[in-house]
Amino acid sequence: EHSLKLWENLSHDLNYNVMFSQRAHVSLFHSPSARDDAARRYNIMRLHGTDAELWDLEDLKKNIPHLNYNNARFPILGAAVQRRAGNARHDSTVWGFARAADSLGVDILQNCEVTGITRKQNLIESIETSRGSIKTKKVGFAVAGHTSVLWQMAGLGNLPIESHKLQAFVTEAMT
């Protein structure tokens, strides 16, 4: 819920349109065990004050009549629904954060690989990059799936993060 509220105000906070569009999230379930998992997630969301719904097959047919219910490869039993959920344009979001960081004095170097991290006593002293060395007093890692690699490079041990492939189907209007 907290995350969703942050997204709802992010364009205003960054003074940059991140193109956040709340169109709901409907997660179909195709087996009794998937239904149980959806019910578990639904209950967790409700306990945290997030509006969520569990739809049985009749609710689903009433709300989304155009799905292929009869000839679907996997039987559709129902869905977990979060009506306020949505998505944002990833590139707009990145540029909004980059512009905000720049206005706070952050230097952003694109296409620049970190090759090493120099520590003195218990502090990071410099970052070695494919473009040379950068002396610094503060470091922030914002590199998505590569964060754990840099964390180890800095000698900070293992982060409990696993990277997983994510596929998205993105469409844009052709003009």
Language-model-detected regions and their locations in the chain:
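Generic secondary-structure signature for well-ordered alpha-helical cores
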Residues: 5, 9-12, 47-50, 65, ...
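Internal, well-ordered alpha-helical segments in soluble enzyme and binding-protein domains
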Residues: 3, 37, 41, 56-59, ...
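Central helical "cap/lid" subdomain
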Residues: 129, 133-175
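Helical element adjacent to the flavin cofactor pocket in flavoenzyme catalytic cores
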Residues: 75, 79-138
